[in-house]
Every structure is written in structure tokens, then in C-alpha cells.
């Protein structure tokens, strides 16, 4: 039997040279791997799920976005800045694809664990949730 999972929330990534790619179910990869492109921002449509987010942005540092509302932009648009590290709180797990390292292990969105790097000038290229 095939198990069909409903999306807990939707993600719309903003990628270097491509802009907004389009909303997709959170289980899909949001971003582009293998092409040396930075994930600059993303929007989450929470679909009733409570999600809190923090992001470490090139040249800015940590930004706390609190509880995410539909169309909250996490990151920057039009500034050419890379997302470097993310921290989420919610009922899901996530992983990120980091420049030169590939995919991290899955981690629970507990509001403490971070995925990515700080102080190494490495870009996050994609993110995935489950």
C-alpha cells in the first residue's frame, strides 16, 4: 500500500539567480543542490502548524522571526546574502544542505538545535522538512 502524507506546511524558497521558486510541500527539497547557489530566503505557509524560526544571515547575524505567519520572509531578498544557519521550533524534523558538506543529519525542531554553520562563510543551499 502507498502511504500518502499530507503536508504539515508549505515552503517557498528564494534562490540566488532564480528568485522565488514556488510553494511546495515541506517534505520536498526547498532550494537547489549541486549548482553552487545560495538559499537567500524562504517563506513558510504554516497551514495551522505553530512554527518558530531563527536564521543566521551573512553580514547580519542571528534574526529571530518568532512565530511564523503566512508569507513571513526568513532571510533577505535582493541583497545577495546567504542563509548560513537555521533554528526551528515545531512538531517536525529538518535538515539542510551546506556548501562543501552536503546534507546534515535530520534533527528535531526543538528551538535549540541549529543546522548549518556560523563564522565559516558557508551557504545553505537547500532545506527539507519531515
Where are these regions (language model features)?
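Lectin-type carbohydrate-recognition ectodomains
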Residues: 1-130
